């Protein structure tokens, strides 16, 4: 309300929805922010459309084990796409269309991976959105995107348990750096030196 109070609470979804994380974006370009949910326990992932958050559309297989989600225009067509981190299956990009569907998709990563965190940023500053994933029990990856394919690169500890990833220019050189939140070990900043 402009005074630092959050008195109003609006439930949405269902009481048994096993949601792990939520991304916000105007998916249908109507001027209202929408909510993009990543669900676990084999439940469908959903987009809830603002401003009322009652209308929803599913995306994904309908039985994914998703752990994180981010949104960005991965193929440069002007439509927002959804990038999902999964465990026990490959991570996915669901491409948005002008019709509001997300039927076109691309899988990436190891099907045996346990990806718990995902973040999008233009790591090499070439105008394309790239992907960073944080994995449990194995090394992390980033994927450079040239719109036709994703080129995989490895970083991080061999047996690390990364549950969170964020990206930002921490040293002021205009190139995005990667920060990982790790369970049972040091949290680590990876400075972007090789992509300059």
Name the predicted role of every residue range.
Residues 19, 42, 66, 88, ...:
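Short coil/loop residues immediately preceding or within conserved phosphate-binding loops
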Residues 1-17, 48-65, 95-113, 143-164, ...:
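Blade-edge motifs of beta-propeller repeat domains
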Residues 20-29, 67-76, 116-125, 163-172:
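Beta-propeller blade termini
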Residues 31-33, 78-80, 127-129, 174-176:
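Glycine-aliphatic tripeptides that mark coil-to-beta-strand junctions in extracellular
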Residues 35-39, 82-86, 131-135, 178-182:
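Hydrophobic beta-strand segments that make up the repeating blades of beta-propeller
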Residues 3, 29, 40-42, 52, ...:
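Short strand-connecting beta-turns/loops that link adjacent beta-strands
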Residues 43-46, 90-93, 139-141, 186-189:
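Structural signal for beta-propeller blades
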Residues 164-170, 175-196:
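Blade-level signature of beta-propeller repeat domains, shared across WD40, Kelch, NHL, RCC1
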